[in-house]
Amino acid sequence: MPSQVMDQRHHMSQYSHPTLAASSFSEELRLPTERQVGFWKQESLPHHMGSKSVASSPIEKPQPIGTRMAGRLELLQPYKLRDQGAAFSLEHKLFGQERHANLPPSPWRPDQETGRQTDSSLKSAALFSDGRINPNGAYNENGLFSSSVSDIFDKKLRLTSKNGLVGQSIEKVDLNHVDDEPFELTEEIEAQIIGNLLPDDDDLLSGVVDEVGYPTNANNRDDADDDIFYTGGGMELETDENKKLQEFNGSANDGIGLLNGVLNGEHLYREQPSRTLFVRNINSNVEDSELKLLFEHFGDIRALYTACKHRGFVMISYYDIRSALNAKMELQNKALRRRKLDIHYSIPKDNPSEKDINQGTIVLFNVDLSLTNDDLHKIFGDYGEIKEIRDTPQKGHHKIIEFYDVRAAEAALRALNRNDIAGKKIKLETSRLGAARRLSQHMSSELCQEEFGVCKLGSPSTSSPPIASFGSTNLATITSTGHENGSIQGMHSGLQTSISQFRETSFPGLSSTIPQSLSTPIGISSGATHSNQAALGEISQSLGRMNGHMNYSFQGMSALHPHSLPEVHNGVNNGVPYNLNSMAQVVNGTNSRTAEAVDNRHLHKVGSGNLNGHSFDRAEGALGFSRSGSSSVRGHQLMWNNSSNFHHHPNSPVLWPSPGSFVNNVPSRSPAQMHGVPRAPSSHMIDNVLPMHHLHVGSAPAINPSLWDRRHGYAGELTEAPNFHPGSVGSMGFPGSPQLHSMELNNIYPQTGGNCMDPTVSPAQIGGPSPQQRGSMFHGRNPMVPLPSFDSPGERMRSRRNDSNGNQSDNKKQYELDVDRIVRGDDSRTTLMIKNIPNKYTSKMLLAAIDENHKGTYDFIYLPIDFKNKCNVGYAFINMTNPQHIIPFYQTFNGKKWEKFNSEKVASLAYARIQGKSALIAHFQNSSLMNEDKRCRPILFHSDGPNAGDQEPFPMGTNIRARSGRSRASSGEESHQDISITSVNCDTSTNGVDTTGPAKD
């Protein structure tokens, strides 16, 4: 019977077209849930029905509908007469394990392999379709894998005689050998055979995509290597970072390259050595001297920051980077006061102080090509040990010299700058830290943000130069050859092509609107660093050459990048206009169109991604900046919190390199219509400086009134932005920008001819910056750069208040009480403000608390009352008869809790703005407070004489003001002048800030 069955099946196969056999593999890799259990009808195998023959193999076993072993049914699929295209082939077993060798040897002999190779190749050709039935047997390669799987099987699955069962076709089996060794007829053996025939899913998939060897060796490999995505899927997981760098070229297929590459979410660069150590897990009881002694053992300490020691960390900065390396190596995990130190390198922020800018690296310009690195090493080595001398890519006349010690770099800079070496006058400049490292870190985030109007707030990129890369730029070309400074090599090649690909991919149809001379929308900027700019100089020439063309004609506000200043190209600022046509005329320098262009809202594109491709040196003389300054910007006029690097050169003429209609040829349009500043003599251009300190949304910088009293403005302004907060001057908007207030600049201060000042800025804050604080030029008619509004009106108001408080930090200090100064006699003020008084305290309660120890030491006291709720407003004023009385009074109350009402408030003392008894009387005697209940008035006491300490009536003025109609705290009805007494410190958190709210006065 077995021979009859097999013969019948053999005849069946002879009627089958080879393509039908091949198509039976089309669903070979379907998920296990798609195995169509119970699909087969019994009439598919008519010769099995009623058969009582001895089943010597699982193939001869009849299966009812709904059987629980799907694997048995799958073995029958190659012999199904109907639906040949959807059959599940016995060739499924090609992916089995070596356990197939456990099969009984007699039905399957090595000599039965005749003709197998051809048949196997035909069937494997259609093994992977696309998951669809292919009755014609046509080969389809758009399936689960895009690689040529047929080639894998043709080349890899050459089976030997050891794979008899899985290597040969059933129709080729010679059943003459069946009776040689009878087979046991038990369900257990049958199940074992079937189990051996069926590979599990892991074995199945691993045999397909390994491309390593025969599938019978799959169980000898590690499971981690069987990952389907390892080689077949193109998603390398857990691979080495260096390998990623080498294989990265061309791996990005989305047109943006590094945006979705290994830079996103991965630590491309490990911790880079730095001269500054960030030491965590510090015991707060450790003395500063102890820390200094510990770390000074490894070298001279440049700075020791211990203000956050109570929070568990300190920062130590060395002059020599080797000192930091040794300290980290020796002290890592060492115990200090029973705490193991956790030390990391700390890279200075992108807005470092002046001393942090020079990190031991200087850039050498105009080097004679005949000079070798050895020659330079001899010349510069006299000032200190040199760590490395690097060449600048594509700039043979530029060199980067890195010293171990920053003091050596400073000495070399001072001694050799502007000196002649090999017949050429060299130029030296400091280099900021980590140029190439920040290049790669910011590449993905800054690319689209800079050019296409996306500004992410609260990220590191908001204070860092924008860098970009496109397409298939090879990441391996961006290297970091030193511990702290990197160089950019070969980035220019292939970049333009990649950029055009990015433009076509990300913004279809946009290229037709871009002038041909505009090579790319890329933005590569630098914060006064030639280590970056020298390497990117050539890129700048091709990337940013505008040639009179404006940027993309995007309508609306330009992209804001905090900590950035606009760009100037041939005297005209590169920006995004509201009206591109009118602005194109402005770019051409047409004077008659200037006023129209300004009214069409030429918006300075602060921090835009444009590169004008010209060295800043070309305009240095015109802008009044000295070429001998400590830093300049090449190829890009962006200042990244580094405006202090420029030095004013008073002898330089203030001229633009091309006819600038904004500067010397201001049209006759009225200032109110221009929304700008009238024309001024060019000699005042540099001196009339507009500083911007701690700018917030809706705030304008502090202005020196003497500048405005001159009654002549200037077309371009210098602006320093050391703390340029996102959304600064966001309220200074224009019509057409829905996110901005439509407040006209000339309506704020009409006496200035259209100039703008923030009303919240008090005269006390007014002042001008030093020449070193003058940054890049804001070129345009509007003194304030219109920027997008990023926050709500509530946030804007809070920011304005915070801005006012922040700008008055110096004023706040003058109200602080310093006992030491009183003891020395340096401070003779006598009027104090007592803050954090419980609101339920009355004047009598307060007097009782004071008189316990200080009766007769004061002659004035006033506790303002809120007449609406009949409670005090939380503070009081007292005038001591002698400054020395303040010392015991301070010791009694300052920092102490109040006894009554179980209050948690802690009293604090500060000086009041109005000082002295007579000044206080003069302030209140004509106040509407005199119309209130006597219990709410200030209380006077005799200062001297026999009645010293006794209460005296408060003198009434002759011009007492009437009640204003709304409740106030001090009298309920005080005017602004009356309030000023309480406005010294009108709540418990501020000093010297005038506040006129009802609960504040």
UniProtKB/Swiss-Prot annotation:
Molecular functions per Gene Ontology: RNA binding
Alphabetical list of Gene3D superfamilies matching this protein: 3.30.70.330
Biased composition (Polar residues): 978-994
InterPro entries (alphabetical): MEI2-like_RRM1, MEI2-like_RRM3, Mei2-like_Rrm_C, Nucleotide-bd_a/b_plait_sf, RBD_domain_sf, RRM_dom
Chain ranges of the RRM domain: 275-348, 360-433
Region (Disordered): 100-120, 767-815, 941-1001
GO terms, biological process: positive regulation of meiotic nuclear division
Annotated Basic and acidic residues bias: 793-803
Entry keywords, A to Z: Repeat, RNA-binding
Keyword check for NADP: no
Function of the molecule: Probable RNA-binding protein that may play a role in growth regulation.
Full protein name: Protein MEI2-like 4
Organism: Oryza sativa subsp. japonica (Rice)
Gene that produces this protein: ML4
